[in-house]
Amino acid sequence: MKYLIVLYAYVLNPLLNLIPIAWIDIFYDNMTHVGNAMHHPYYLIAWATSTAVGLFVSSLLIWRKYKISYSLGLHFLLCSGWILSCCIPYSVDLPGWINDAHVWIAIACTIGFSLEWLILYTKKESFIYSEIKTLLYVLQFVFLICFGTLASAGHVNALCEMLYSISVNGVLAAFVLRFVL
């Protein structure tokens, strides 16, 4: 199990995230551009699936180990929302509501996932274990950096998406490897 987590978090997911560097300007374009305008929809879905599965599984492993209450249905909905968002095409030729659905599902799921972790600050069971407290501080810092990347560009770009996918998955995987397994 440890081998699979290392392979996923530190090889497969980063490689999937770094591929667009050869295709687009990661400071301007986003992953949707790769999937729709550049006609690589299977890459886009693979990227979203990789990100979502890693975040879903790592979170569950941590929450179960430390007996932190969570909503499995909500967590599944938030993580699978990224995949759903990437399956909805984005194009100027499509009705605006389709493009809006693509964008707002992705935004809602990203914010929702981040809030799932940040809300743990309000739960007393989160502070029983010092390692969970440390994880929350590290995740808060990572979320802040990701938001800073978004704010500095003024829009969602591939760098922001790649940074969130690699860093949050990496932090959660490192925690799972060190404290859970």
Where would I find each of the regions flagged by the language model?
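Membrane-proximal helix-loop-helix units in multi-pass membrane proteins
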Residues: 78-135
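Terminal transmembrane helical module of multi-pass membrane proteins
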Residues: 124-181
